[in-house]
Amino acid sequence: RTQTDAIAEVGQKWSLAQTITGPYINLKYPITQEDNGTKKVTMGNVTLLPDELSIDGQLSTEILRRGIYKVNVYQSELVIKGFFSSEELRKSNVDMDVLQYQRAAICLNLTDMRGLSEQVSITLNDSVYMFEPGMDGRGIESMGVHAIVDLSALKDDRKLPYEMKIKLKGSQSIYFTPLGKTTRVALKANW
């Protein structure tokens, strides 16, 4: 047994190293094409990244032993908040009137879903939405959770505030993808 084997064994039983990407919004819109007089409608996707992404968290770490090897694991409690704005949607060259705001998906990608210890929810514009497992073909990456939400408020050029709390465990490391125009991460840990 090598240290790599010990890390892999702990990762399979506890949870792997985590990379958190999001939240971000996916909006669908129809694309009409004409081919030999026949109209064909397909769906396009546009992704809206947050203007502000702030992550505050507490990591509780421990060391698990496998033979002579030690493997770091953690449990985290994260508060992710910020806001979205329709300004970036305007830059996408997609007609704002055809976007399907009422069936938008808010997405959060995770490396290892087994690390979630409770269902994820988000407060978005004073409404609470529960996430479902999987990305339903709407994510930047394939692993994660999503919620179908009504984002009609984005039509009105308003800021759309969000906040979510996540309890997530992992091993070895935790990473955050800096998707926001402004991204801030502040973690406290006992190691």
Question: What do the predicted segments below correspond to?
Answer:
Residues 1-16:
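Alpha-helical transmembrane signal-anchor/signal-peptide segments
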Residues 16-28:
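Solvent-exposed, non-transmembrane helices and loops of integral membrane proteins
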Residues 12-13, 26, 34-191:
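Soluble non-transmembrane domains of integral membrane proteins
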